[in-house]
Amino acid sequence: YYDVSADGSVRLAPEDYARSLYTGAEIDQLLLGMVGSRPHHPHDVEIGMSVWKGLYSLPILRAHHIRFLSEREYLSEDLLFHLDYLAHAGAVAIVPEPLYYYCQNPASLTGVYRADRFVREKRFYEKVSAELALRFPPEVYRPRLDKAFLGRVRRCIAQEAAHNKNSLRNIAAICRDPLV
């Protein structure tokens, strides 16, 4: 896909899929790449989780009552959707051509400072951890989930530093949190 910044500049987003068709246990590996990256990988996640770049089977959505949650309920609702949907998908096909323009929105909930972001990140972490525990042993998903969570914690700290006059106190509290 193409990534369009707030100033209008366009760049091809780096996407690196191992293959164009995933089936069976390969779908689990694709999902784990959305959850987080392996320790040696340079980024926090290996595969973008955004649902806007996918097409989904309406019969699967209806048969399993899969719904897309609001970002106001959980952060990164895209991953929660994929956790549910990919458990029922028989195959995932990747189209290599960039067919979508994603326009960055600085006013979206993802980019705006929220005083409760860290609390919501922890709630999201616990929800994803509980969902993954139903499908995988902890040693399979925990390193990936923890690495991605720490990346999200870094974003919380950066937002505190940039937008909150009490940032040192809040950052210290984040760093002392047992989950971190």
Language model region names:
Residues Y1-A93, Y100-D116:
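Donor-binding/catalytic cores of nucleotide-activated saccharide
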